[in-house]
Amino acid sequence: MVTTSQEQGHDALTATSAVTGLPQKRFYRQRAHSNPIADHSFDYPARPEDVDWSALYPNIQPDQQVEFADIGCGYGGFLVTLGEMFPQKLSIGMEIRVKVSDYVVDRIAALRLKSGKLNGDAYKNIACIRTNAMKYLPNYFRKGQLEKMFFLYPDPHFKRAKHKWRIINQALLSEYAYVLRQGGLVYTMTDVEDLHQWIVSHMNQHPLYERISPEDESQDPITPKLYQSSEEGAKVVRNKGDHFLAIFRRI
């Protein structure tokens, strides 16, 4: 059985703020990005059936499954927003950086604790695992399992020689199409115009995706949250940077 960071435990909730009760990011600082090709050490399942989702979601029902995946979830701001917007859905954040994923795990634990003290049951529908989604996504999800996937402010890998490391490429798009159900959506957001053009070009070239219309984008209740729910998005807003949004439907 695969163990998770929740199972391994951050029960002590150290380095938390006395005011908010939430973990403080200054104790979890790490480089902005991580090399996805490097041989990191991960504990990953051989197949989706081997994942013990109940270790991540205390209230999961027998017929329930993860439907939303935030790939490269960073410090978990958008993941928390998903949990609040869709209390009946299970959302998973996947993050490659160990300290950052530890922070998200501790953040969720603290939010659950605060909610419990108020006789609430919030945030038990979100979780985070440390993994390399570029390598192990099909190990976690069955064919057609996901309803929504999010790629928000991914590493742009500016150097041409590193473009192959970008999380949107033709080979990976086929893997995403495998775990995404027909009619499911892929949300992409970046502040780098070159990366945005790369994403749109590769998604348009793939036969299993179509870009939704600007009207559909504006009517999606998630769209406004994409701009500053995540920590990276909020930083772009503070710096008065540009946002480039593109949403695609699995066909």
Curated annotation (Swiss-Prot):
GO terms for molecular function: tRNA (guanine(46)-N7)-methyltransferase activity; tRNA binding. It is found in: Nucleus. Keywords: Methyltransferase, Nucleus, RNA-binding, S-adenosyl-L-methionine, Transferase, tRNA processing, tRNA-binding. One of its GO terms (cellular component) is tRNA methyltransferase complex. Its main location: nucleus. It comes from Drosophila willistoni (Fruit fly). PANTHER family: 3-DEOXY-D-MANNO-OCTULOSONIC-ACID TRANSFERASE/TRNA GUANINE-N 7 - -METHYLTRANSFERASE, TRNA (GUANINE-N(7)-)-METHYLTRANSFERASE. This is tRNA (guanine-N(7)-)-methyltransferase. Catalyzes the formation of N(7)-methylguanine at position 46 (m7G46) in tRNA. InterPro entries: SAM-dependent_MTases_sf (IPR029063), Trm8_euk (IPR025763), tRNA_(Gua-N-7)_MeTrfase_Trmb (IPR003358).
